[in-house]
Structures are given as structure tokens and as C-alpha cells.
């Protein structure tokens, strides 16, 4: 859990990690399978840094989210092509989790999704409504999962907001 864990002051907090000694030393898939009825106000997704697992964690998190809850996925705004590769090849590494946000922006109109332009991208999701991305109209491409297309359209794809916009929208 690292530095931030002790600073989180809530009645219920769980950490899930198969490698780190935390509340639940298991994979997120195992956790979601075994703890079906547990609900949370806030779920932080920062796991394997690969698209498929991040997407699965977000979908599973939705089933464990209280009605007014929020999910945050970390590392969704990679700074370079090498940083977004699914296998770590450099010091800076996000993996391709940005694709999970893209998929949700393309397919799930019942989520409100924004990405705060901070700390390699923090994407916030909560139940609500969003206008789905239209590949041809919004980014003029069918190949949205290509990094170069993402690079040129990241603000639109991630629905990027600034830290001050985040504070105004979520903290006021």
C-alpha cells in the first residue's frame, strides 16, 4: 500500500494485491469473485498496467460500487509510446490501461468519465451519463486503439480535465 495507505482515514478500506502484504493478498479477480456483496464508496484501480486486466477490474468494481461511489484508474495518460507498452521497457511505465478508458468511452453511456491531467492520468468514473465517443466524428479514425491516433486525440479520448476543473467539479 505504500505511503498513502496510512493517510486514508475511512471506516472501511481494503487493499488487494497478490505480491504485497495487504488486507487481501490475492489477485483482483479472486477478490471480486470471493467478495460479491461488499460495496465501496471509492475504488482505486492500479494493478497490472495492462488493458484487459484494467478493463476487467473497472467492470468488476462497478458491481461493488455504492450508488454515489467513484472509481479511479491510475496511469491512464501515458507520456510516450514506450511508456504505454503492455510490457515494461523503460523507467516510465503506464502500460496500455488508457485503452480501458477508451473502451468505456466508446461503449458505456451509463458512466460519467473524466481524466484528471495529473500523475500520469487519473481517470474518474461514476454512474451517470456520457455521450459516447464517435470514432469518425470525434477523432476522425477507426483505429482508436493505435497509440499515434491516441496521441493526437488524447484530450478528447480521455475527456481530460485540469486539476482546478477537478476541484471545482468534485470537491466543491
Regions found by a protein language model. Name each.
Residues 1-35, 40-42, 77-80, 85:
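SAM cofactor-binding core of SAM-dependent methyltransferases
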Residues 42-44, 72:
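Structural motif
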Residues 53-172:
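C-terminal substrate-binding/active-site "lid" region of AdoMet-derived donor-dependent transferases
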Residues 46-49:
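Switch II (G3) loop of P-loop NTPases
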Amino acid at each position: 500500500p505504500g505511503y498513502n495507505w496510512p493517510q486514508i482515514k475511512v471506516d472501511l478500506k481494503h487493499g488487494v494485491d497478490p505480491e504485497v502484504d495487504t488486507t487481501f493478498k490475492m489477485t483482483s479477480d479472486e477478490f471480486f469473485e470471493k467478495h460479491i456483496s461488499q460495496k465501496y464508496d471509492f475504488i482505486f484501480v492500479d494493478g497490472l498496467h495492462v488493458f484487459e486486466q484494467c478493463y476487467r477490474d473497472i467492470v468488476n468494481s462497478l458491481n461493488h460500487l455504492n450508488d454515489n461511489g467513484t472509481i479511479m484508474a491510475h496511469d491512464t495518460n501515458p507520456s510516450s509510446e514506450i511508456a504505454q507498452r503492455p510490457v515494461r521497457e523503460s523507467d516510465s511505465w503506464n502500460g496500455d490501461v488508457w485503452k480501458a478508458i477508451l473502451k468505456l468511452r466508446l461503449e458505456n453511456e451509463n458512466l460519467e468519465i473524466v481524466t484528471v491531467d495529473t500523475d500520469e492520468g487519473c481517470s474518474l468514473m461514476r454512474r451517470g451519463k456520457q455521450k459516447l465517443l464517435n470514432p469518425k466524428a470525434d477523432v476522425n479514425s477507426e483505429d482508436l486503439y493505435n497509440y499515434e491516433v491516441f496521441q493526437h486525440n488524447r484530450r478528447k479520448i480521455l475527456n481530460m480535465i485540469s486539476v482546478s476543473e477537478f476541484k471545482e467539479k468534485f470537491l466543491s
